[in-house]
Swiss-Prot record:
<dbReference type="Pfam" id="PF00537">
    <property type="entry name" value="Toxin_3"/>
</dbReference>
<keyword id="KW-0964">Secreted</keyword>
<feature type="disulfide bond">
    <location>
        <begin position="25"/>
        <end position="46"/>
    </location>
</feature>
<dbReference type="InterPro" id="IPR003614">
    <property type="entry name" value="Scorpion_toxin-like"/>
</dbReference>
<keyword id="KW-0800">Toxin</keyword>
<dbReference type="GO" id="GO:0019871">
    <property type="term" value="F:sodium channel inhibitor activity"/>
</dbReference>
<dbReference type="InterPro" id="IPR044062">
    <property type="entry name" value="LCN-type_CS_alpha_beta_dom"/>
</dbReference>
<keyword id="KW-1015">Disulfide bond</keyword>
<dbReference type="GO" id="GO:0090729">
    <property type="term" value="F:toxin activity"/>
</dbReference>
<dbReference type="GO" id="GO:0006952">
    <property type="term" value="P:defense response"/>
</dbReference>
<dbReference type="GO" id="GO:0005576">
    <property type="term" value="C:extracellular region"/>
</dbReference>
<protein>
    <recommendedName>
        <fullName>Toxin Cll1</fullName>
    </recommendedName>
</protein>
<dbReference type="InterPro" id="IPR036574">
    <property type="entry name" value="Scorpion_toxin-like_sf"/>
</dbReference>
<dbReference type="InterPro" id="IPR018218">
    <property type="entry name" value="Scorpion_toxinL"/>
</dbReference>
<keyword id="KW-0872">Ion channel impairing toxin</keyword>
<feature type="domain" description="LCN-type CS-alpha/beta">
    <location>
        <begin position="1"/>
        <end position="66"/>
    </location>
</feature>
<feature type="disulfide bond">
    <location>
        <begin position="29"/>
        <end position="48"/>
    </location>
</feature>
Length: 66
């Protein structure tokens, strides 16, 4: 699946400023706890592709970003 990476404790997206190819987003996406294949910055948040179905993405159910 694909989607915005989400911080499980805050319910917020992973923010980014360098749009498009983004090393930080790519690294976060490919981290063992996320399991994605490619990440980049889209609309100032990290978008991730190739995620396993088990990885939560934004928005988290019952948790709004605060």
């Amino acid at each position: 699946k694909e989607g915005y990476l989400v911080n499980k404790s805050t319910g917020c997206k992973y923010g980014c400023f360098w749009l498009g190819k983004n090393e930080n987003c790519d690294k976060e996406c490919k981290a063992k706890n996320q399991g994605g294949s490619y990440g980049y910055c889209y609309s100032f948040a990290c978008w991730c592709e190739g995620l396993p179905e088990s990885t939560p993405t934004y928005p988290l159910p019952n948790k709004s970003c605060s």
